[in-house]
Amino acid sequence: SRCTHLENRDFVTGTQGTTRVTLVLELGGCVTITAEGKPSVDVWLDAIYQESPAKTREYCLHAKLSETKVAARCPTMGPAALAEERQIGTVCKRDQSDRGWGNHCGLFGKGSIVACVKAACEAKKKATGYVYDANKIVYTVKVEPHTGDYVAANETHKGRKTATFTVSSEKTILTLGEYGDVSLLCRVASGVDLAQTIILELDKTAEHLPTAWQVHRDWFNDLALPWKHEGNPHWNNAERLVEFGAPHAVKMDVYNLGDQTGVLLKALAGVPVAHIEGNKYHLKSGHVTCEVGLEKLKMKGLTYTMCDKSKFAWKRTPTDSGHDTVVMEVTFSGSKPCRIPVRAVAHGSPDVNVAMLITPNPTIENDGGGFIEMQLPPGDNIIYVGELSHQWFQTGSSIGRVFQKTRKGIERLTVIGEHAWDFGSAGGFFSSIGKAVHTVLGGAFNSIFGGVGFLPKLLMGVALAWLGLNTRNPTMSISFLLTGGLVLAMTLGVGA
């Protein structure tokens, strides 16, 4: 699965009868949804971008100077003048120079002098700013079912589907082939202040250098370089890259300050680099909150017969995935398709299956299958696939796992924020409370009661509530009632 190869992975486990779960997706992360009677699905936010954003300013990094002209007057002869002073795109400077008999003036003193030069910009020496439009930013969400096929990190799963969202998008339904349909309704949020963000892009001149950065609007507007808007042939403040020398009689030198690319690159050190792909300008941060509908998902292979236990061989022995799960792959030499008999037992309890399958109903197909992912309780375990067996020690502790999943649940609820609550009606408010409880405590509840059936959990919740009602000690009564209520809510709830 896609999530197996990513470091930032989260699990959302639906309760009995779950038809809808709420996910928080961020760039670089991946969420695996598991629900009883449904195929497991990986969902992740693949990209945030805008196609062809609007240009704001262009800055010139290296001036191109031409057609230098100088005019001078003797003392008392009035100001020197050039027609170029009134032309757009020309940089001029007025000054006074020493005049006398040695340079063709009858009087000694200060005479007027003016120099002008035509200023343009060298080719491939521009820095252009682009602005995002929140209404045009596209959020790409990808969905992939767990099919039992091993897919390398650099390969694409054949069952992978893509949905795109903007601020005005409606619900999207994706068809996952034999696994049914999944619906997505996503609320989008960028991780940056778009009104104050500019993408600064340089003309490409060297392959080893980055070409775009994500900068603040005020910093961009304060750059001390010549600038213009798109379509304007003339540069504003072109004098910023031109220097005039000291006047000498009828002469004034004009100097080009040279290429400013190095100065700009030094100023951009440490600034987030922007990614540009064709005409797509990508954002580096952001998230989407998605309501995922699971009601039309269906399990594949339920009608298959069980595989012959004696005809399995390890292709990849059980390995730690890095996500508190175990992954493995087997080959099968018997008749296909069929269902893989897989289970795990803890040390000292040979009759209790402790494996929580992330790959539900693993199968061998005519053209693939055999990849299995499962979660095991901490401690010594034995994994069985048919007649194959493998000793496995799962690191960690049950208490630590509960706290970790609770922390992730709180983080999810915090990111969802105000969208998690519905104050429009009493029913909506109480439904929001239920969803919040599932979001925060769902992972921890599944860690504790993952191997317990629906009916035992229901009876346990009823028993705790009954004890609370019949206990005379107020503190114990409230404790039993709260615990029983939580167990019943997590067992009977349909939201997560």
Curated annotation (Swiss-Prot):
Pfam families, A to Z: Flavi_E_stem, Flavi_glycop_C, Flavi_glycoprot
Keyword Glycoprotein: yes
Cited InterPro entries: Flav_gly_cen_dom_subdom1 (IPR013755), Flavi_E_Ig-like (IPR027287), Flavi_E_Stem/Anchor_dom (IPR026470), Flavi_E_Stem/Anchor_dom_sf (IPR038345), Flavi_Glycoprot_E_cen/dimer (IPR011998), Flavivir/Alphavir_Ig-like_sf (IPR000336), Glycoprot_cen/dimer_sf (IPR036253), Glycoprot_E_dimer_dom (IPR038055)
Cytoplasmic topological domain residue ranges: 469-479
Any Gene Ontology CC annotation: virion membrane
Glycosylated residues (UniProt): N154
Residue ranges the record marks as coiled coil: none
Disulfide partners: C3-C30, C60-C116, C60-C121, C74-C105, C92-C116, C92-C121, C186-C290, C307-C338
A GO biological process held by the record: virion attachment to host cell
GO MF entry, a single one: protein dimerization activity
Chain segments annotated as transmembrane: 448-468, 480-496
Chain positions covered by the region annotation Fusion peptide: 98-111
Stretches of the chain found on the membrane's Extracellular side: 1-447
Key words of the record: Clathrin-mediated endocytosis of virus by host, Cleavage on pair of basic residues, Disulfide bond, Fusion of virus membrane with host endosomal membrane, Fusion of virus membrane with host membrane, Glycoprotein, Host endoplasmic reticulum, Host membrane, Host-virus interaction, Inhibition of host innate immune response by virus, Membrane, Suppressor of RNA silencing, Transmembrane, Transmembrane helix, Viral attachment to host cell, Viral envelope protein, Viral immunoevasion, Viral penetration into host cytoplasm, Virion, Virus endocytosis by host, Virus entry into host cell, Zinc
Protein's UniProt name: Genome polyprotein
Organism in which the protein naturally occurs: Louping ill virus (strain SB 526)
Taxon lineage: Viruses, Riboviria, Orthornavirae, Kitrinoviricota, Flasuviricetes
